[in-house]
């Protein structure tokens, strides 16, 4: 058990930016508005530029109201605000550049974590801190691993594989396309590989319905795809302009999960929105944008009881999202993480992965180096947070 460590989280935003922020300044630059700041967030993780922009914004004349997600990114991901949180148990992830992304769990409490930086999937048993390279980098043609999802009924670990070598991802693996990979959940042996349609697809996250169909978000296109149990390829399940990636670049669709109402819910990463896909007779009948507090780079979305989800925001928080009709409410469970990317629930614990992906995308190394070792954190869920 010596590898299980207790850590103080001493990074990330010190407050939850649930309300709009106000920036004051002098009288020389009245033409700069928060829309310009917001536009700068439409590139995937451009925190350095946003920091410069926020400094410039402090010289603007009148009071300028900026959405929380702009300020949270600049302050949270650049670690310019420090806070000390209560101690959390953590487990380190070996390596200098694993950049852990998605995390999923099985009924025995085992965790499976996809690695963007060096590829492969690691399995961790939190009770003993036993860590195993479950899928080796490059195995079964795989490249950078994004979303992972454990399908125990079919003995399959599904994983999103993307060729990110140009960004510093693994050189191992022969696939050049974005693909959904299926590995044996007991042995890690590759079973299935299904390419996403189109030349510029990006498999991000995964969920399943009760009939065994697999759904994935395509972050490069405004499309949710579905793979039926007996199908050999994907079909389009839903498409909407509202899912479109920003014109300036960056991720569109990201998190995906079924709610207790039987409908499908998705997030958009850069724009920061939450949608419900109303399902009728197995098809997406309507796409509804839900209204609520601003979201700062919403990533993984996981079911969490009746009409609720767990959600991680890239600005540093683990939230509970409660759906009420066409609106949602946010309750922050824990803040202060370094660019969290995913969450998996095991009984009364939420395991949060810190991806620190801004360092992965910073090819010029202007931001320095990520905090090592990479970690996953155990966040206790109180009775009041579950329902």
Description of each model-found segment:
Residues 5, 10-16, 22-23, 27-35, ...:
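Short linear motifs in low-complexity or flexible loops
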Residues 171-211:
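Asp-box/WD-like beta-propeller blade repeats and closely related beta-sheet repeat scaffolds
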Residues 175-185, 368-383:
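Beta-propeller blade signature
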Residues 87-93, 130-138, 189-196, 235-247, ...:
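A short beta-strand motif characteristic of beta-propeller blades
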Residues 96, 112-117, 151, 157-175, ...:
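Conserved beta-strand positions in repeat-built beta-propeller and related beta-rich domains
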Residues 119-122, 166-167, 180, 222-225, ...:
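Structural signal for beta-propeller blades
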Residues 94-108, 116, 139-156, 160-163, ...:
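Beta-rich, blade/repeat-based domains predominating
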